[in-house]
């Protein structure tokens, strides 16, 4: 997946250099389709952060496309790779005694709609120098929480550290706001912040309130990663009755903050493709000449 995103970024970076020999006046016909690349930070909200706070800032990278339906409304699609991390050692209350931690590499694909505060202008190059927008949509998330033990990294979901199964593919609802800054007729900079509501409490592999009975867990690795209090001598004599592991009443979520470069694609790209496609179709359906 990382290689796919890198290849996509290289392709997007090359687009502005295609057809640069033509003047602006030759290309000023309206453009409604944009491509983008961006980067920023991601942070998560769940059991391994202080109440009302977010976790450590981790990097993300995104590619996307956007189409303007009219001067205010647009539809967009984005593919984002990001990391999340949580650690009880950073807790400012008694949760440090739980001694749990996780890190994960995640992939999100989302389809969203955006609305601008002010119209973009009759032509794309007549848009205002600064505009504010809001967006919302729906997406799908792949996440894979992992933890280290004795110098090795283990994926937690297959181990079922709480004795429960859950899917690593979940729907998400992204919502957020942003600002669009015009660099020149063809380029924008977006500064955006968006929160993702999820339908799972397992981004960090922690959910149930009480520790599970060790006898129901798969193996010794699962048992050790399920209850890590013995590593710092905080384990009670009866772990299934004493101590809180998670909070199943609240779902996990994450926040993405990005700076994105957008480029308006010329219509000639699509027109040339249509001409080539139609030419091939005509050649395919052309009847053979009689001898």
Language model region names:
Residues 21-66, 145, 252-258, 262-268:
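Short glycine/proline- and aromatic-enriched beta-strand/turn motifs that initiate or cap beta-hairpins
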Residues 29, 67-71, 117-121, 142, ...:
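Outer-membrane beta-barrel strand-turn architecture
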Residues 31, 55-59, 105-109, 130, ...:
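Residues that define the transmembrane beta-barrel architecture of outer-membrane proteins
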Residues 37-39, 63-67, 111-115, 136-140, ...:
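Residues on the lipid-exposed face of transmembrane beta-strands in outer-membrane beta-barrel proteins
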Residues 45-51, 94-102, 159-165, 244-247:
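Extracellular loop and loop/strand-boundary signature of outer-membrane beta-barrel proteins
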Residues 72-75, 186-189, 267-270:
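Repeated loop/turn-to-beta-strand initiation elements of outer-membrane beta-barrel proteins
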Residues 73, 78-150:
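Gram-negative (and chloroplast) outer-membrane scaffold detector with strong preference
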Residues 110-114, 250-291:
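Outer-membrane beta-barrel "beta-signal"
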């Amino acid at each position: 997946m990382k290689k796919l995103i890198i290849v996509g970024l290289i392709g997007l970076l090359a687009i502005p250099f295609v057809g640069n020999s033509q003047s602006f006046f030759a290309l000023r016909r309206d453009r409604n389709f944009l491509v983008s690349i961006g980067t920023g930070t991601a942070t998560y909200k769940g059991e391994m952060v202080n109440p009302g706070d977010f976790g450590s800032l981790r990097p993300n990278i995104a590619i996307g496309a956007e189409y303007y339906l009219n001067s205010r409304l647009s539809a967009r699609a984005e593919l984002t790779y990001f990391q999340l991390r949580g650690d009880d050692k950073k807790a400012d209350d008694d949760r440090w005694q739980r001694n749990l931690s996780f890190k994960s590499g995640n992939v999100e694909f989302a389809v969203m709609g955006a609305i601008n505060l002010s119209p973009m202008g009759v032509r794309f190059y007549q848009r205002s120098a600064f505009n504010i927008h809001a967006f919302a949509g729906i997406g799908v998330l792949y996440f894979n929480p992992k933890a280290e033990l004795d110098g090795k990294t283990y994926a937690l979901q297959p181990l079922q550290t709480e004795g429960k199964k859950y899917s690593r593919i979940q729907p998400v609802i992204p919502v957020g706001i942003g600002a669009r800054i015009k660099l020149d007729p063809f380029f924008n900079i977006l500064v955006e912040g968006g929160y993702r509501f999820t339908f799972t409490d397992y981004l960090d592999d922690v959910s149930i309130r009480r520790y599970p009975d060790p006898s129901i867990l798969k193996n010794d690795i699962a048992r050790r990663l399920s209850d890590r209090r013995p590593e710092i001598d905080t384990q009670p004599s009866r772990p299934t009755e004493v101590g809180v592991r998670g909070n199943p009443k609240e779902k996990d979520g994450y926040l993405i903050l990005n700076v994105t470069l957008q480029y308006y694609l010329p219509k000639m790209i699509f027109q040339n493709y249509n001409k080539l496609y139609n030419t091939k179709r005509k050649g395919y359906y052309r009847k053979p000449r009689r001898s």
